[in-house]
């Protein structure tokens, strides 16, 4: 992970507030539309695993390319949050962090008797398309919530406002998912909204939060067998065929591990560490 966070003045800092709001709304609508279209394109390749994998990574890269182009066109500068030299180290570091994070949460709820692995099997034709799909999801959602909302609000109104607003919006974004509750949205805002925003500020780039988000979804669903933000794994889709039981506040219930109190507490602790390290610089 990179601890460098170059302070590069953005176009939003010198613009009137109403123009910044228009920039936020325009960016949100553009990338939500693009994200939806690219997800549809990905699902058109279902059943053809090699093409499916390629489609996931190509669609994820397409979102990043359009983001880079939009920054150049509308802000008249290179995107400072996409340094090529940090791509592999920070995506890899974020991915590894998520594996450790979700392994720790799963171990806790397993010790409490709320999670058990019944059997283990690996199907490459199912796993690798999921790997590619969640790369697309990570790229799309991180561009929208960190590249657009967090970055622009941070440039105009400061980091505290950027963390609060982007986390709140990220929680609201998931409130209509299957199995969602008010608590699951609050938990997502805490453990993902704050954590991913703090990781973006700490690293100064999109790669670290993309890596965290990517590894998070992959570990939660296709590896451990939990629902991912309410979207359950069908039999045979996850490496671990598991049984989840007990109180929803512990296990996460139908929404998945993200709605566990332990995921929220540990995620908040990691976010606080990123904020502390950033503030020390």
What does each of the following model-derived ranges do?
Residues 8, 37-55, 72-143, 150-155:
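Juxtamembrane helix-loop-helix connectors linking adjacent transmembrane helices
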Residues 1-78, 221-281:
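N-terminal, membrane-interfacial amphipathic/helix-forming hydrophobic leader that caps
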Residues 10-11, 140-165, 169, 198-205:
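Membrane-interface helix/loop boundary segments of multi-pass membrane proteins
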């Amino acid at each position: 992970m990179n601890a460098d966070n170059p302070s590069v003045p953005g176009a939003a800092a010198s613009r009137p507030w109403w123009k910044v709001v228009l920039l936020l709304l325009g960016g949100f609508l553009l990338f939500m539309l693009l994200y939806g279209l690219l997800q549809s394109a990905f699902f058109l390749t279902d059943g053809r695993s090699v093409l499916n994998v390629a489609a996931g990574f190509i669609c994820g890269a397409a979102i990043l390319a359009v983001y880079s182009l939009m920054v150049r066109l509308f802000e008249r500068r290179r995107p400072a949050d996409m340094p090529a030299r940090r791509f592999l180290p920070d995506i890899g570091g974020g991915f590894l962090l998520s594996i450790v994070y979700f392994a720790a949460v799963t171990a806790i709820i397993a010790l409490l008797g709320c999670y058990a692995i019944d059997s283990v099997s690996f199907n490459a034709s199912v796993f690798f398309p999921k790997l590619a799909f969640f790369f697309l999801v990570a790229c799309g959602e991180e561009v929208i919530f960190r590249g657009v909302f967090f970055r622009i609000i941070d440039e105009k109104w400061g980091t505290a406002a950027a963390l609060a607003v982007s986390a709140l919006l990220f929680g609201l974004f998931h409130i209509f998912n299957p199995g969602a509750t008010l608590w699951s949205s609050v938990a997502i805002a805490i453990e993902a909204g704050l954590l991913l925003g703090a990781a973006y500020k700490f690293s100064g780039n999109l790669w670290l939060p993309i890596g965290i988000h990517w590894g998070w979804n992959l570990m939660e669903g296709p590896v451990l067998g939990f629902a991912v933000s309410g979207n359950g794994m069908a039999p045979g889709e996850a490496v671990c065929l598991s049984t989840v039981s007990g109180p929803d506040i512990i296990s996460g219930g139908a929404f998945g591990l993200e709605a566990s109190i332990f995921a929220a507490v540990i995620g908040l602790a990691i976010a606080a560490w990123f904020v502390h390290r950033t503030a020390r610089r």
